[in-house]
Regions:
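Conserved loop->alpha-helix
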Residues: 1-128
Length: 128
């Protein structure tokens, strides 16, 4: 589970079905086997070396998420470690598992926020 609050950013590199993410904030703490939300997508840390870590991604994950679109080297991604029992709940509780696809059809700037209009590909999500 995650709070949805970004803790760090990283630079993305892809080698087939392996993502290599350079961590730009050296205080970001993780261990092999940890769940990390990469742009909101729950992935498992496979390997850590120096200031980067590796995760495996399936073809399905690349097809159904924005990670498949981020093919150029050094694209920035948001990083968030999984929620620990001792952590404060400063955001929301989210799983990081992808349930469906949508397309942003309109972005409107409000006084202190943004309003995104999303067209869902799955009618079951229309109530949201």
């Amino acid at each position: 589970m995650f709070t949805g609050i970004i803790q760090s950013i990283g630079k993305l590199k892809k080698e087939k079905n392996i993502l290599i993410i350079e961590i730009l904030d050296q205080t970001f703490d993780m261990q092999i086997g940890d769940s990390i939300a990469v742009d909101g997508i729950c992935l498992t840390v496979k390997e850590i070396s120096n200031n980067q870590f590796k995760v495996d991604v399936s073809e399905e994950t690349l097809k159904k998420t924005t990670l498949g679109e981020k093919s150029s080297i050094n694209q920035i991604v948001n990083l968030e470690p999984a929620l620990r029992i001792s952590d404060r709940l400063g955001g929301h509780i989210v799983s990081g598992h992808i349930d469906g696809l949508g397309k942003v059809v309109n972005i409107e700037k409000l006084e202190k926020s943004w309003l995104l209009s999303i067209k869902w590909h799955n009618k079951n999500f229309s109530k949201y």
